[in-house]
């Protein structure tokens, strides 16, 4: 069987908007990674860039299950200051976009396409975003019956 390669005319990059209010971080990152790779399209090919643009709004209202909010640590050594460790609660106040971006980045493939796909991810703290002229489609994430705390 021959490898399917979509033609350049078949590669359309649609726009989706996801509301992150009370959505569990892992479920949000999984769905965003699927949309960024273009796996929701019938013309998907792993070697071709058929991904979509994803806008995530209300990033500051993301939910984490269990007691990860205080226990989990996000560490980054940006040099010259050295190692810096923040809990998710502190990082959610300062920079919630960074939490979501790193979760989505971990779910993308580790290759050259990942950078291009990650560049199509746009995360905003509030409900407003400047991409209304692109007419993004609303993407609903199905929630499990358990409540996120």
From Swiss-Prot:
GO MF terms held by the record: mRNA binding; structural constituent of ribosome
Entry keyword set: Ribonucleoprotein, Ribosomal protein
InterPro entries named in the record: Ribosomal_uL13, Ribosomal_uL13_bac-type, Ribosomal_uL13_sf
Biological process, per Gene Ontology: negative regulation of translation; translation
Keyword Ribosomal protein attached: yes
Function, in words: This protein is one of the early assembly proteins of the 50S ribosomal subunit, although it is not seen to bind rRNA by itself. It is important during the early stages of 50S assembly.
Assembly and interaction partners: Part of the 50S ribosomal subunit.
NCBIfam families associated with the record: rplM_bact
Protein family: Belongs to the universal ribosomal protein uL13 family.
Record's protein name: Large ribosomal subunit protein uL13
């Amino acid at each position: 069987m021959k490898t399917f390669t979509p033609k350049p005319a078949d590669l359309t990059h649609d726009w989706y908007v996801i509301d992150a209010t009370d959505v569990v971080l892992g479920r949000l990152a999984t769905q965003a990674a699927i949309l960024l790779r273009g796996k929701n399209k019938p013309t998907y090919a792993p070697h071709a860039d058929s991904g979509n643009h994803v806008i995530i709004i209300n990033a500051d209202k993301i939910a984490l299950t269990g007691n990860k909010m205080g226990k989990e640590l996000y560490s980054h050594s940006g040099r010259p200051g050295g190692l810096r460790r923040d809990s998710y609660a502190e990082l959610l106040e300062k920079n919630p976009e960074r939490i979501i971006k790193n979760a989505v980045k971990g779910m993308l493939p580790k290759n050259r396409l990942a950078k291009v796909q990650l560049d199509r991810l746009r995360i905003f703290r509030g409900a407003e975003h400047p991409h209304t002229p692109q007419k993004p489609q609303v993407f609903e994430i199905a929630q499990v019956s358990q409540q996120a705390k």
